[in-house]
């Protein structure tokens, strides 16, 4: 099984982002904690990209202790940039436990370039 995953940084917060739009990945809390461990891959949060019929994607955020959180602005911006590149669209809607978040890519560059700008309307 191939897993599409990314390690990204947004204003000092780092994330492991897993594309789970095919819904084939189901990690346990212990597995999430292990991925977030700085002695393994390491990140502030693990983010799952999942399918959503009313938005470009649904995001699930997990903190390094394995607990799920509602949303994260920096993580949302990272995922929005990935999906923007994929869909060639500067305006992205992402569903989260905290509600729908709209992201606008301000300066569109290749998402693998470390320099890009976006904003997220959090509420």
Segments predicted by a language model, with ranges:
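Short, solvent-exposed secondary-structure boundary/capping segments
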Residues: 111-122
């Amino acid at each position: 099984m191939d897993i599409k995953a990314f390690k990204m940084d947004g204003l000092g917060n780092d994330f492991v982002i897993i594309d789970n739009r095919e819904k084939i990945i189901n990690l346990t809390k212990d597995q999430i904690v292990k991925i977030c461990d700085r002695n393994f891959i390491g990140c502030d949060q693990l983010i799952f990209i999942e399918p959503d019929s009313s938005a470009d994607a649904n995001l699930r955020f997990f903190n390094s202790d394995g607990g799920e959180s509602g949303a994260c602005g920096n993580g949302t911006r990272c995922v929005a940039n990935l999906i923007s590149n994929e869909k060639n669209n500067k305006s992205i809607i992402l569903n989260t436990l905290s509600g729908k978040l709209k992201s606008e890519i301000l300066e569109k560059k290749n998402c693998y370039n470390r320099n890009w700008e976006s904003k997220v309307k959090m509420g």
